[in-house]
From Swiss-Prot:
The gene is rpmI. The lineage of its organism: Bacteria, Pseudomonadati, Thermodesulfobacteriota, Desulfuromonadia, Geobacterales. Keywords: Ribonucleoprotein, Ribosomal protein. GO terms for biological process: translation. Residues 1-47 are annotated as: Disordered. The keyword Ribosomal protein applies. Pfam families: Ribosomal_L35p (PF01632). Residues 10-24 have a biased composition (Basic residues). This is Large ribosomal subunit protein bL35. One of its GO terms (cellular component) is cytosolic large ribosomal subunit. Signal peptide: none annotated.
Length: 65
């Protein structure tokens, strides 16, 4: 059996934690920041865990990470 290819876009966006969950960063942080409040920008800096519904599909995209 050949190796499964890693989806390079997903590899740059997601990381697996030690417990096997998948971590992601928030969107809406790259530009047009003047209209966003200080509080909103601060909260967007924190990372979060991918929803349970999406875990399986994303794990398939990054098999070796």
């Amino acid at each position: 059996m050949p190796k499964i290819k890693t989806n390079r876009g997903a590899a740059k966006r997601f990381r697996k934690t030690a417990s096997g969950k998948i971590k992601r960063n928030s969107a809406f942080t790259s530009h047009i920041l003047t209209s966003k409040t200080r509080k909103r920008k601060r909260q967007l800096r924190s990372s979060s865990i991918v929803a349970a519904v999406d875990q399986k599909n994303i794990a398939r995209l990054i098999p070796y990470k």
